[in-house]
Amino acid sequence: GLLRRCILFITTDSGPMHVGVAMHVPVLCMFGASPIPGFYPYDERSISVRAPVPCHPCRIHECPLDGADYMMCMKRMPPDLILKYADQMLAEHGERPAYELPRPKDFETRVAEQADGSFVLAPKGAAGRVVRPVLPAGIKPHGFD
């Protein structure tokens, strides 16, 4: 019940992210060790971001790095990007709780490489139409098309 009262859910790539999507809450998800193409939120209200670090996605639940590099995938998450998307999502959906929002449209997505080398989540079969940008820098397509 608590998630359905949220106007925006900023979370990590975890179980609560999927619960938020299931409750139709706009979800802004920060990806650390997990690959975005395997675990990204799957409706039109979701945005996924990752830090531009060379070890992403390591798929390791216990970071093997030490010192300043420990958990760099989360520590180097660009705060300005998170705030930008949070502001954008609040502007799109208003400050109404999820239970007051209309049910999101269902669509299948794919990870599509753009001419500039960045990647986006786009609906399958929608030539050239971008749904949500994904922070560039090393996301590799995983055969989702």
What annotation goes with each model-predicted range?
Residues 21-143:
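Nucleotide-sugar donor-binding patch of glycosyltransferase catalytic domains
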Residues 1-32:
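Donor-binding and catalytic core of enzymes assembling or modifying cell-surface/extracellular glycoconjugates
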